[in-house]
């Protein structure tokens, strides 16, 4: 209890205090200005872009995560040779430090030495993928700037975020599948249900509550993430990939406006609380006994 108060409570209260003042760099106090920082942030176009990017990246990545976790868990619960090794490979992105794996992605998405560009080029898909984002003329000799073009940079961040959260969701889905009584599977097979029908009419409805839990954690982890966007693009190019955590850092730390930065960071708090309440509500409604 004391640990939670010190680690969570004190910083939160201090951030709320700073958001109501005009505190700047070099000082942890300032004059009380009420909700002026929140009003200024809301009318700032850069803030609105960061908020929009946060929502897009969060929900787009979670859509990929849910589909990927459902497919992977469906196969990983079966018995096959090397099952433990495949599970190890799946969980590695979650176990590795975020900064480390993001630096690896920097190499994968490098504008000159990109292994992704090389792979897509060998598959003759590079031009089609780039064209889907309005970038034309891409080839092995002219690789795309994955992190230098606004649309490609957003797409890259969504993929990295989904890849990072996917292992956690897979673990939750596997646990959910393990909780399904064997009698249910036996009854479905006796009724002649195909694998696809069993997945759609039996497995997914029974896993819905735990899937909502996975989505909830994924939304929270992605929305508050700072490292991926900061290390990949620093919010660029031209602030096109700024999210609320990186924009709060840019305003509060880089620009020295501690009060304004604290206000920006606190915008996420009520949104995440609302998402949590809604997800738990629907999880309870969808629970199957």
How does the language model describe each region?
Residues 1-289:
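A structural signal for multi-pass alpha-helical bundles of membrane permease subunits
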């Amino acid at each position: 209890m004391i640990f939670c108060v010190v680690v969570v409570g004190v910083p939160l209260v201090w951030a709320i205090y700073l958001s109501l003042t005009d505190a700047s760099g070099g000082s942890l106090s300032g004059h009380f200005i009420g909700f002026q920082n929140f009003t200024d942030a809301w009318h700032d176009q850069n803030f609105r872009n960061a908020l929009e990017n946060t929502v897009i990246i969060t929900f787009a990545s979670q859509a990929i995560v849910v589909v990927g976790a459902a497919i992977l868990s469906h196969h990983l619960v079966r018995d096959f040779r090397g099952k433990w090794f495949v599970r190890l490979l799946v969980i590695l992105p979650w176990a590795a430090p975020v900064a480390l794996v993001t630096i690896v992605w920097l190499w994968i998405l490098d504008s000159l030495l990109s292994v992704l560009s090389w792979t897509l080029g060998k598959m003759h898909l590079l031009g089609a993928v780039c064209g889907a984002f309005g970038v034309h003329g891409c080839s092995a000799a002219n690789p795309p700037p994955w992190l230098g073009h606004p649309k490609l940079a957003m797409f890259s961040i969504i993929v990295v975020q989904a890849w990072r959260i996917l292992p956690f969701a897979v673990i939750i889905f596997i646990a959910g599948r393990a909780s399904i009584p064997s009698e249910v599977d036996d009854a479905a097979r006796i009724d002649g249900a195909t694998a696809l029908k069993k997945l759609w009419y039996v497995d997914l409805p029974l896993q819905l509550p735990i899937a909502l839990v996975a989505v909830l954690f994924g939304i929270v982890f992605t929305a508050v993430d700072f490292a991926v966007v900061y290390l990949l693009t620093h919010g660029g190019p031209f602030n096109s990939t700024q999210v609320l955590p990186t924009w709060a850092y840019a305003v509060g730390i880089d620009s020295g406006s501690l009060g304004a930065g604290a206000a920006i960071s606190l915008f996420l708090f009520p949104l995440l609380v609302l998402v949590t309440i809604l997800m738990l509500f629907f999880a309870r409604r969808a629970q199957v006994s």
